[in-house]
Swiss-Prot record:
A Gene Ontology cellular-component term: ribosome
Gene that encodes it: rpmB
This protein's record includes keyword rRNA processing: no
Matching SUPFAM superfamilies: L28p-like
Family classification: Belongs to the bacterial ribosomal protein bL28 family.
Keywords: Ribonucleoprotein, Ribosomal protein
Protein name per Swiss-Prot or TrEMBL: Large ribosomal subunit protein bL28
């Protein structure tokens, strides 16, 4: 499984570590991902999603059904 949020589509970014002497080396900024189990009332089933902290806030704000529909329209859900 790749490190992509299934709700927001967030994925890892690439940047630089900058030392005191300003020498730059490449690094990866990973997304704050975790697996979370939700009860989907409209479908009467449990859903396990791999979401970021921002995705969890979005679900709390607009609801699970609306968030899943939005993610499906944008193509973030693979199932």
């Amino acid at each position: 499984m790749s490190k992509i949020c299934q709700i927001t589509g967030k994925k890892a970014m690439v940047g630089n570590n900058v030392s005191h002497s300003k020498r730059r080396t490449k690094r990866v900024f990973d997304v704050n991902l975790f697996r979370k189990k939700f009860y989907w009332v409209e479908q009467d089933c449990w859903v396990v999603l791999r979401i970021s902290a921002a995705g969890l806030r979005l679900i709390n704000k607009i609801g699970l059904d609306a968030a899943i529909k939005r993610a499906a329209e944008k193509g973030f859900l693979n199932a």
